[in-house]
Amino acid sequence: MYLHNYQQSKNKETYLLIFLFLFSLLVRIPAIFIFGDTDLENEWRNLVNNLTNHGTLSLINFGDFYVPNFFMPPLYAFYLYFFKVFNFSNEIYILVVLFSQSILSSFSVVIFYIINKLFFSNKISIFGTLIFSLFPLHIYACGQISSVTLQSFLIVVFFYFFFTTVKKDNFFNICFLSLTSGLLILLRGEFIAFFILSILYIALFLKMNLKSIVIIILLTIVVISPYLIRNIMLVDTMTITKSIGYNLWKGNNPNSTVEGNAHFDLNLREQINKVPKNKHYDINVDKVFLDEGLKNIKNNPTKYLGLYLKKIFSFIFIDINSSNPNYYHPLHYLPVLFIGITSIIGIILSNKNSYQMNFLILFFIANVTIVSVFFILPRYSLAIIPLQIIFSNIILEYIKNNFFKI
C-alpha cells in the first residue's frame, strides 16, 4: 500500500512537471512572433559575424585587423554562433534562437518549482511557480536577442544544484554545480564574485567537506579554462572580460542615469583615439574608462552615492525615470513593483535560522549591491525575480501558518 501511494505521488509530480513545462512553452511561443526580435543587432551581430566570417571572437576591427574580444563575456556569443553553423536563413535562424530560449525558460520554470518545494507546501510552490512562468518580463525576454534568458535559466539551475550538493555532495551533483558555475562566469563577469561568496558560505555555514569544496573550485576552473587559456595566449592576461572600467564609467559619469549613459565627451574621445590599435586595444580602452569613472566618483562622491542608492531602489522596485518607451506599460512596471515590495516583506518575515533561505537572501543582497555599482537596465530584473518570488512566497507561508491553512 505504501509503495502504491508513493508511486501515485511520484506520478502526479511527474505530470505536474510536464504540465509546467508545456504550459510555459505554449505561453512563450506567441510572444516570439508578437514581440520577438527579427535580427541580430549591435554587439551580437558583430561578434557572430566575425566568428562566422573570420573565425575570431572580435567585436571591432580596424581594417583587416580584428581586435580580440575582451569586452563581452563569450558564452552568449557562442550560443548564438552554435545555431549559425546550421546555415538557416536569417528569419529561421532568429526564430530557432528565440525558440531555444523559450525552451530554456520553460525548463527553468520546472526547476524553480523543485526549488520552491524545499521551502514551501505544494500549493504555495505551484502558485509561486505559475507566477514565475507568467511573469510578463520573463515571457517577453524569451523573444529578445539578449543573454538574460540564458542567465535566468543558469541561475535557477545553479540554485538547484547548490542545494542538492549541500544535501548530498556526490560527484554527479558537484559536476553539475561546477559546470553551471563555470558557464555563469563565462556569461556574466560579476558571477565570479557570487561564486566566491557561495563557496565561502558553503565552507563557513554549511560545513561541507573540504575535499568537495576543492573539487567544485577545480572543476569550475576546468570549465572556464579554455577561454582563460585563449586570453593568456593572446595577451598574457588571466581574465574572462575586461569591461569593468567601461561599465563603471557608463554608470558613473556626469550624464549618467540609473540606466547609465554612454555619451563620450571630447576629452574622453581623444584619450580613446590615442590608444594603440593592437591586440591589447580592449584592455587599454577599458583602463581609460576605469580611470575616468574612478575620477568622477572621487571628485563628487556625494552625487554618485545618491545615484548608487537610486540604482539599488530601481533594481529592487522600479526606475521612476526610465528612458525605455515601454517601461511604464502596466504589464511591466506593476508586477515588477509589486514583487519588489512583497519580496522585502518576505525577507523581513523569513526564518533567520534557515541556512538555505539565508543563502538566497545573501545572494540577493550581493547581486543588488554589486550590479548597482554600475548601471541598471530593465532586463536586469529578470536575474533576481526568481529570488523575489521565493521571498514573496514567505508571506503566503506566514499567512498559512498564522491564520488559516492553504
Describe the predicted segments one by one.
Residues F119-N122, F158-F176, L184, I202-M208, ...:
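Membrane-interface transmembrane helices that cradle and orient dolichyl/undecaprenyl
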Residues L95, F107-L134, S152-F153, F172, ...:
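Transmembrane-helix signature of polytopic, membrane-embedded enzymes
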Residues K12-D39, L219-M233:
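Transmembrane signal-anchor helices characteristic of membrane glycosylation enzymes that use polyprenol
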Residues V235-K311:
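Membrane-proximal stem/loop segments at transmembrane-domain junctions that anchor or position
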Residues F21-V27, G128-P136, Y160, S181-I185:
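Short helix- or helix-capping micro-motifs
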Residues F99-F119, V157, F161, I341-I348:
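Transmembrane-helix motifs of polytopic, lipid-linked glycan transferases
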Residues I29, L40-P68, L75, F82-V85, ...:
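Extracytosolic helix-loop segments that constitute the early lumenal/periplasmic catalytic or substrate-binding loops
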Residues I32-I34, P68-M72, F83, Y93-I103, ...:
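Membrane-embedded glycan-lipid processing machinery
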